[in-house]
Amino acid sequence: MREFKLLLFMASALLLFSCEKPVNNDPPLHMPEVTLRTIAGAWQLEEWNGEALADDTYLYIEFDGKSQRFEMWDNLGSMYTQHKTGSFAITKDENDKVIISGQYDNGVGDWNKSYEALFTRRGNSDYMAWITDSESMLFKHIDSIPELN
C-alpha cells in the first residue's frame, strides 16, 4: 500500500510540474499616437455616445496632415448633405493626452469642443476615438469618402 501511495504521489507531481502555461508569443497590441501623419485620410463616424448612427445618418471627415486642413460631409440635423471645410490642430494637454481641435472656414467659428483623440482597434479595422467628459465619438478609418447626394 505504501508503494502505491508513493507511486500515486510521484505521478501527481509529474503531472503537476510537467504542465506549463501556454506562452503568448503575440506582440502586445500597440496603437500609434494620433499625430498629423497618422490622422491623415478618410474617417466615418460609426458611434456617437456609444450608440450606432441611424442607417440614413452619416458624417465623413478627411484630414490632410500636411496642410492641417479637413473636409467634412454630414447630414446630422438635416436631410441634405452639409459640406464643411476648415483647419485643425493636434496638441497635448498638461496630462500628455493628445487633443484635437478645429475651426470652420465659413465663419461659424471653432468646433464646439476640443477632444482627446486616440486610436483603437476592433477586429481588423482601425478606429479613432474622440472623447470629452460629456461626449464620445468613434470613427472608422475608410479607404475613401463615398459618393454623396
Predicted regions and their residues:
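Bacterial N-terminal signal peptides that target proteins for export
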Residues: M1-L8
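C-terminal motif of bacterial Sec signal peptides marking the signal peptidase cleavage site
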Residues: L15-S18
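Edge beta-strand at a domain terminus
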Residues: N24-P28, T81-D93, Y127-N149
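N-terminal helix-cap/turn-to-beta initiation motif at the start of protein domains
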Residues: D26-Q44
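Short, solvent-exposed loop/hinge segments that bridge or flank secondary-structure elements
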Residues: G41-S67, Q103-W111
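Short beta-strand segments that buttress and anchor functional surface loops
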Residues: E47, E71-N75, I100-N106, M128-T132
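N-terminal glycine/threonine-rich, aromatic-flanked beta-hairpin/loop signature
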Residues: L53-K97
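An anionic, turn-rich surface loop/hairpin at beta-sheet edges
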Residues: D96-R121
